[in-house]
Amino acid sequence: MNLPAKLQMLLFLLVATAALGHCPADDRIWPYNPVESIQVPPASDPAWPRNGIDHFILEKLSTAELSPAPQATPEQLVRRIYLDLIGLPPTPAEADAFLSDSSESAWESLVNRLLDDPRYGERWARFWLDLARYADTAGYEGDPDLPHAWRYRDYVIDSLNRDKPFDLFIREQIAGDEFAEIMGAGDLPAAGPEEIVAMTFLRLAPFTEPRGDESRHELLSEITSTVSSVFLGLTVGCAKCHDHKYDDIPTRDFYRLQAFFSTVSIPRPEPGDGFQIGGSLPAEFYRDGELDWAAQKRAQLQQAADGAEAELTRIRADWQQRIGGMAGFGLQAMGDGLSNNYIYSRSTVNDGALHTAITNCDGKQWSFIIDQVTALETGSNAGSNQGQWFADLKSPQHVSLGQYSQGSGRIHSADAHHLGEFAQILIYDHPLTLEEQSHLHELTARPNTAQPPQSGLQFWLDASDLDADPSTPNPAPGTAVAAWTDRIAGITISQTDPQLQPSLSVIAGTALPGVRFAGDFLVGALPERTSFLTQNSGSLVVVFTARHTHEGYGFEVGGDGSFLSTFINPTAAGREDFDALLGQTPLSVISQQERDHFSQLSARRRFLPQHLNRLQPLAMSLRHSYGPPYEPGVPVTRVRIRGEYDNPGEIVEAGFPSVITGHDQPAEIRLDPFKRWPTRSRRMALASWIASPKNPLTARVIANRLWHWHFGRGIVATPSDFGSLSNGPSHEELLDWLAMQLTQNNWSLKSLHRLIVNSATYRQTSVHLNAHAAELDPDNLLLWRFNRRRLEAEAVRDSVLHVSGRLNEEHFGLPIFPPLPNDIAERVKYTDSKWDTQYGPEGRKRSIYIYQQRTLNMPFLQTFDAVVCDESRPRRQHSVTPLQILAMYNSEFVSQEAEHFAQRVRDQAGSGLAEQIALAFQIALCRSPRPSEQEQLQALAAATQPQTAGLDAACRVLFNSSEFLYVD
């Protein structure tokens, strides 16, 4: 029948949108009507269907006068099923095993094998963790660690691998602690460790320190919204402040659902928990071998830390010997260019000897950043404007910083990390006159973060070595140069604007009282800000307490005169912050490679307590309040007007959404028959109702999620919203049939996977030119072909590692910390970072094990739309951006793995370039190259210099191909 185009389009719209149908029994609309048995429709083409799914798909296609696409090639199918079920491409041997099996059962056997593969759980747990808003930190200010959240991630992986019935999976996460029967008058039955870990689901929302009723209201509201959207596919959270704008969910129903969680409480914070995020509950390791694994891991961590400490001690001794021989510095003016007009001197440093240098600064402005000084008391500094001296002290207490004469001067603080305080400020050459003292009345010190000069030079070297060092060519004016030799000092020279730096400014006039001088010495500690002025010749001396840290202070002198500055060898004072040397400019005496090695060892030691804490048998779970006489009874739940915690309305009792039940009567809650635990069983009642086969939503929602994750789009396009905004299902009867299949097969998710991937619908090709179908159904709602889609971010990273041969396939365990890009790694290195960068195999496990820090998403994964969830995420965005190309071609991660991929090919294919290219295609794309592809990549490899990098370049091209990044 040839229908006019407009009529044909209208017919398609009527078929595809499948407007919401009514249930004749009680006039409730889909999806609130019960799931009932559905008859599989007859097939217009009996040869095409492989199972019931295909009958429903073919019925809609036939009505729209469309036909399904041909089956995909075996090479496409084997790659598709591997990436779909385990998130990794097949090896050439695995692909060949399937391609060479011509039996009718080859596909079904492969599907069963992959569903039994432990990598299946690692792949599919990622989708559930997005729903559960999983993260390893709590978010908000400080983003505190949730040290035991990783156990929930392993619980999900293990549950999926064991094909735990989905109804049990629901009950454990909502009320795992309430399903033990109360058999007598004894103690309350304890929940098992697996159930305690499972209830981490309720705890995973971003959480700040509790603020009484407000925090509790927000916590319970978030739990209510998440449970409703994840398990029921309802946006109940939209009714928190007012009746739902689109669905029949009144505000009253939101708080009736919230009442099921009214007895939830968070464990008390652990001792020393400055963030007050709440503690953990005991939960022994329960999986086979997990207890032994934890003990072995503790021993490994301790052994690694002990080895790192011994190596650090050896390195420090070696560096002290290198650094401690000589010390000195040079000064050079900023003019039209660098010339040899610096003044330089040096002296032997012996057990803390001090080095002093002087330079003329007539008409120039200099900025001195003084660092690595504990303190040194020098005695009088009076004397000429030029000269040098040194002292030998074992335990310096404070330091003299500066002399100027014949002009005005200003002193600027260049940093604010001074842990102690200024103890004294002196005018040292002569007793202060009354006039001089009148100019020193205001003494305050304003703390500021260091802001280095915007132009100038920073020298950490003997200046005479600068010209001889080929790594420090003469820069243009206004640029900075830094270097190290075996002579340690520190100075920044700059023509700076004083406004660019935190200030200890010259202040004239009257000022607030409170600090005074008695003779030569300051009486009392300085307040927050220190400013002073003198117009007379003499030595300005600032005396620090011994708590001065390595960050340093800067002092600036402008105008006519001279300035004297003193430095002390940083190692001679025996400072505990010797490690801070690595935070300075690159060293030539201590190479960059040595610095990196030292930093890695220091991190091993620093992160040990963090990892050991994670290995305690605990879970980031919730608990129920025990009620009288131990704790308060069941709180009264009230509607909160406009969602405001302090604006109570009517009292409500726990109950299910009236749009589903048809009434708003309270739920039946099976209370303790001995009346000792009045707070118990509320969440159990909710979990039992959600997990019941009679619930019209639960099975439909999870069946739709699996369909969405297999095809890229659900039968209901909005997986967590089955309400009116979803526009209903495209194949209503099919979704009901899938839901019925799930419940009849003991809620087995693997049985539903098996049903979907064994269908002819799933096995269609994605590359099918059908202009008529493309015009009629451009979004492929009727599934006349398979949907081509890009791999998720985690699958991209895992596939790159798998193809290079470097993927660590160890299952379960602590979070991992892969290397970050250099700019981000430098930024987090000197903060209170939680990122313990792992450069070895432990950092190359699958992406599901990566530490999920809410304030630090891995840039490579973020580029491919990965998220660290603050809320439940039912689906990922799939963007196409230039950044993805750059990440796959220029990132250090892909570059390294391309080199290893090329080496893997060389090892297996020999030295022949043609054979190497052919094998690279088999490994990356599961097929042989076409003649044109073979020719192009061989030409690229041959033209690349050096010659050994040719195959590396070819492998990088394969990583960047759409075929590698997409599932066909």
Positions of predicted regions on the chain:
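Extracellular carbohydrate-recognition regions
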Residues: 172, 320, 324-327, 445, ...
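Sequence context surrounding c-type heme c attachment/ligation sites in exported
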Residues: 178-179, 183-299, 861, 873
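Short, solvent-exposed beta-strand-to-loop segments that form ligand-recognition rims
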Residues: 370-398
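Extracellular glycan-interaction patches encoded by glycine-rich segments
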Residues: 335-338, 344, 390-423, 429-432
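Extended recognition patches within non-cytosolic domains
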Residues: 248-252, 304-314, 421-459, 468-470, ...
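Solvent-exposed strand-to-loop "edge" motifs in beta-rich extracellular domains
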Residues: 359-362, 463-466, 543-549
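Extracellular glycan-recognition modules
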Residues: 182-195, 321, 328-339, 351-353, ...
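Primarily short, surface-exposed interaction patches in extracytoplasmic proteins
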Residues: 45-79, 84, 89-119, 134-187, ...
